[in-house]
């Protein structure tokens, strides 16, 4: 739809840095939301809105969804005139009155499955605290997602969280779609180190404390791991923790932390072999893993002959500098930031001969 002169004027005003003593002008113009001014800006050809409830900035289409959920018709009209896709609003329009307004402004009568999936993943793309919290609020328990077969979205989420979702049997047996979505947002927050979002989920979903611990292990987030294990006292079996840490390759910080806490380093090497993680396997050897014959047998069973050949050598030794019991995440990260396995170098030198 073509923007009115009034909405264009508001857009220009929303781009300005308005002094606090002139905030009454913004209130009169409808540029006020959650006790704060609405600011408009563009970044990399995308339109964003800032307000007190999302100070980091949220894409205009996503903000439209929040306005629709709140039945804020003035802001719906304004955001659409500024260039938002009204179909995003329809996804979160729960009242008939708001749905009718969306259709008056050009929304489709009904969004098909592919379009809803596109909206879902486009909205999730911006990995900030404000956006992930807002995504959770917009999509969780959203009756309009019933238009999408749960299996479609489940399969997409399972693919995005492949490896992590496969071990949820260690946690709980709540496989509801709503619980899966919450786990999805929580995992993104831990993966990207979004502290505000992590705190939000931690306070709101106490039954998912161990899920956060699993995410910290899986995504090699040693800061979150230390906070949960040492400060918040969230507990799991230490060898189960090590198992999760070994699923993704080069998870040195999480593996080291579990090792210092008493995990079996030979079992960690076996998990690394099962997952074809050469980097993790050699790091376990650096930490003292020495069950080479058992590891070689496992590698042959997995038809991973490169690992089997590597474990045939007899020249590996623990790296003494790694054996000091460091649990401070800052020191662990500093120690392992540019770490290269000494024993992997031994193997590579042998291969070059």
Curated annotation (Swiss-Prot):
Subunit structure: Interacts with host TBK1 ad IRF7.
Described purpose of this protein according to its UniProt entry: Plays a role in virus cell tropism, and may be required for efficient virus replication in macrophages. In addition, inhibits the phosphorylation of host TBK1 and IRF7 and thereby negatively regulates the host cGAS signaling pathway and antagonizes IFN-mediated antiviral activity.
Record-linked PROSITE patterns: ANK_REP_REGION (PS50297), ANK_REPEAT (PS50088)
Protein name: Protein MGF 360-11L
GO biological process entries: symbiont-mediated suppression of host cytoplasmic pattern recognition receptor signaling pathway via inhibition of IRF7 activity; symbiont-mediated suppression of host cytoplasmic pattern recognition receptor signaling pathway via inhibition of TBK1 activity; symbiont-mediated suppression of host toll-like receptor signaling pathway; taxis
ANK repeats: from-to residues: 59-88
Record key words, sorted: ANK repeat, Host-virus interaction, Inhibition of host innate immune response by virus, Inhibition of host IRF7 by virus, Inhibition of host RLR pathway by virus, Inhibition of host TBK1 by virus, Inhibition of host TLR pathway by virus, Viral immunoevasion
Family: Belongs to the asfivirus MGF 360 family.
Domain of life: Viruses
A Pfam cross-reference name: Ank_3
Record InterPro entries: Ankyrin_rpt (IPR002110), ASFV_MGF360 (IPR002595)
Lineage, highest ranks first: Viruses, Varidnaviria, Bamfordvirae, Nucleocytoviricota, Pokkesviricetes
